[in-house]
């Protein structure tokens, strides 16, 4: 299956509930590369790269998130031109600073 890249924004009660750590753990478990970060507007943004089925599974998992989260929406975003370059060398998946 071909590799894909998806950039999403998750809205709801998604900060202060372990969402970034959960996302990183789930992505590594699925073999998905990328990053996750908080945004100042209270949302969480993530980029997932890898086999199409694994990326789709990761996005689907984000619709529920960890137990303490309340996900109101998961929005697909256009992949920013530099988004893939933000995957840190030597790290398959990472948490980036808040933007």
Swiss-Prot record:
Encoding gene per record: acyP
Enzyme class: hydrolase
InterPro entries for this protein: Acylphosphatase, Acylphosphatase-like_dom, Acylphosphatase-like_dom_sf, Acylphosphatase_CS
The species this protein was found in: Nitrobacter hamburgensis (strain DSM 10229 / NCIMB 13809 / X14)
Pfam families named among the record's database cross-references: Acylphosphatase (PF00708)
EC number: 3.6.1.7
Keywords of this entry: Hydrolase
Catalytic residues (positions): 20, 38
A molecular function GO annotation: acylphosphatase activity
Family: Belongs to the acylphosphatase family.
Official protein name in the record: Acylphosphatase
Catalytic activity, reaction form: an acyl phosphate + H2O = a carboxylate + phosphate + H(+)
Record domain Acylphosphatase-like: where: 5-97
């Amino acid at each position: 299956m071909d590799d894909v890249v998806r950039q999403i924004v998750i809205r709801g009660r998604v900060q202060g509930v372990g969402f970034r750590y959960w996302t990183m753990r789930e992505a590594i478990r699925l073999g998905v590369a990328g990053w996750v970060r908080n945004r100042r507007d209270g949302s969480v943004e993530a980029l997932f790269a890898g086999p199409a089925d694994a990326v789709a599974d990761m996005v689907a998992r984000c619709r529920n998130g960890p137990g303490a989260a309340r996900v109101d929406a998961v929005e697909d975003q256009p992949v920013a031109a530099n988004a893939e370059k933000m995957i840190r060398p030597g790290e398959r998946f990472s948490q980036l600073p808040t933007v």
